[in-house]
Amino acid sequence: MSYNNKSIKELHELLVNKEISALELTKATLSDIQAREPQIDAFLKVTEEKALKEAAAIDARGINPDVVTDGISIGVKDNIVTEGIETTAASKILGGWIPPYNATVANKLSQSGLITIGKLNMDEFAMGGSGENSSIKPTKNAWDQTKVPGGSSSGSAASVASGEVRLSLGSDTGGSIRQPAAFNGIVGLKPTYGRVSRFGLIAFASSLDQIGPLTPTVEENAQLLNVISGFDKNDSTSSNVAVPDFTSKIGQDIKGMKIALPKEYFGEGIDEKVKEQILAAAKHLEKLGAIVEEVSLPHSKYGVAVYYIIASSEASSNLQRFDGIRYGYRAQDIKNLEDLYVKSRSEGFGPEVQRRIMLGTFSLSAGSYDKHFKKAGQVRTLIINDFAKVFEKYDLILGPTTPTPAWDLGARVDDPISMYLADLLTIPVNLAGLPGISIPAGFADGLPVGMQLIGKRYDEETIYQVAAAFEATTDFHKKQPIIFGK
């Protein structure tokens, strides 16, 4: 029997009332994964033996009635280190690496009774927006297996949307949670920068990376954010701010709430059908009592250029540690130390990672630092200021999550610029360190369309309030791909 259509609150009631055991639920989840994985390819590793052992231990001690996540399974993106479980960031260079420690979020999952059932596929080192840059295999879209699932948290989104797992963790550097959530018709949140510890997250771009939850519904998303949030002394960028109950405003009405609609998010390059769905969603929020007005974010058009300079520069520095000596892939038939470095990195890194390392190294070079990296930092400040100005008058910003629905597998592999432009609407949120969510808001040609809601720093509660109000009065989140029911 499959339980993949039940919320974690419903599953918790079954567990507390002993209508099902954690072991039975885990076995059912493993069956769901086994049935769908050949078509989806969301997992790099399923930790069956470990998961069953943890579930049996939870049954032995008894379900905690006060912890809604106790005994529930979760998938974890493969750039989040897990003690004793191979962690590769979907890269050949980290093949076979078994971490001796847990990421802070991995510990928090265990402390909340969540069972890590496996490691999820992704674009290599989180560099990509389609899931096709995995060095192991490409994940498929849950709605149409000929389409991309989005990236870089490809497995995190597809596993939830296809009914393999109810919950997953991803990471978001320029849209890597929100974009695949949109493409797969689920809920994905990038928290405020610093809200969730990055300790144990394999770094891509340290000033932009953030771990976040992917789930079928808004409430479950908030429940998972409750688990992973909080200050961590091991992460110098972790914020020592109070962690509220993120579910506290869910169910409250949104009358009088002011929502901004940036005209730049509906301009050139935005698919007409996507635009139509998002404007209809804005009208729906107006019917619920919100005040929706057009605004301008004039510097958002520079976001993609700024992002690829800053992110690639930080990546070129972060990825220096993968040298073929301390751990991971080591080239054979080498002549000297330099040859070892060059061959190990050339053979171990995929083409997109190499492209970004070269771009970043160029941007940081003596002749380009002021012209590119420093200038990008200045424009980043202008983007931050644009958001701050809008948030003086408005509670939230609304727009499409992506310019288009999911495209065909292979369609943009040889066109990195068009791939980069797919993150046009999500990137500014990372540059400004703001929280942003994607929720299902319609369909275009049978494929899901995501609506993005952007909030003030540390105000994920208001995002969840509006997202839940929309979800409660629409049916988009109830629609499921064919594979879900298999």
UniProtKB/Swiss-Prot annotation:
This is Glutamyl-tRNA(Gln) amidotransferase subunit A. Residues 150-159 have a biased composition (Low complexity). It is an enzyme of class 6 (ligase). Gene3D superfamilies: Amidase signature (AS) domain. It catalyses: L-glutamyl-tRNA(Gln) + L-glutamine + ATP + H2O = L-glutaminyl-tRNA(Gln) + L-glutamate + ADP + phosphate + H(+). Residues 131-159 are annotated as: Disordered. GO terms for biological process: translation. The active site is at residues 77, 152, 176. InterPro entries: Amidase, Amidase_CS, Amidase_dom, AS_sf, GatA. Residues 132-144 have a biased composition (Polar residues). GO terms for molecular function: ATP binding; glutaminyl-tRNA synthase (glutamine-hydrolyzing) activity. Heterotrimer of A, B and C subunits. PROSITE patterns: AMIDASES. Pfam families: Amidase.
